[in-house]
Amino acid sequence: AEAAAAPAPAAAPA
């Protein structure tokens, strides 16, 4: 859910 809200999925910490 939060990852979808982020502008770029790659920007999310893996």
Curated annotation (Swiss-Prot):
Domain of life of the source: Eukaryota
Give the note.
Answer: On the 2D-gel the determined pI of this unknown protein is: 4.3, its MW is: 19.6 kDa.
Q: What is this protein called?
A: Unknown protein from spot 11 of 2D-PAGE of heart tissue
Which source organism? Canis lupus familiaris
